[in-house]
């Protein structure tokens, strides 16, 4: 079987298989701080490492219009820092809570009952008790082509400045 992207239904497939083909697909639980010092925490299913030397990662933000930015993207572009928290099984419920549609400035750490731990190299806190976290400074933002409905994705690339790993997973 061969078909064009986003034409999976015409090929008889009920769901787009791209997300299942490129697997495993880790969740990047992105913590960021706005220029007003508000803290945001949100999960992103399009996240991955890009290189190890220099250490770089990316996450991709879905937008419904060219004029609406999600809080994580807004914060990273304002302050230039973010933390990629790696979600452990113990954090699944909290991660789901943090994916809620909260107003800008609401702290998802508080909504989800999570501990904020100071980072080593940046001002954005990481989630306490995660298996690992990557402290990052913003490197570049890429605006991918928009779809026919005007939505699309914006890719945020960061340089890793410090790596936290829970001793229990080493």
What annotation goes with each model-predicted range?
Residues 1-170:
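Basic, polyanion-binding surface patches
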């Amino acid at each position: 079987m061969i078909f064009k992207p986003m034409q999976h239904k015409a090929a008889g497939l009920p769901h787009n298989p791209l997300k299942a083909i490129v697997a495993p697909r880790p969740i990047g639980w992105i913590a960021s701080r706005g220029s007003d010092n508000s803290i945001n925490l949100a999960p992103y299913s399009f996240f991955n490492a890009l290189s190890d030397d220099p250490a770089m990662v990316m996450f991709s933000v879905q937008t419904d219009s060219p004029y609406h930015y999600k809080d994580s993207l807004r914060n990273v572009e304002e302050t230039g820092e973010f933390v990629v928290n790696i979600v452990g099984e113990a954090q699944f419920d909290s991660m789901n809570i943090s994916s809620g549609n909260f107003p800008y400035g609401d702290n998802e750490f508080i909504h989800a009952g999570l501990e904020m731990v100071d980072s080593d190299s940046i001002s954005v806190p990481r989630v306490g008790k995660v298996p690992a976290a990557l402290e990052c400074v913003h490197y570049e933002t890429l605006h991918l082509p928009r779809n026919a409905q005007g939505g699309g994705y914006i890719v945020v690339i960061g340089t890793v400045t410090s790596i936290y790993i829970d001793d229990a997973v080493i």
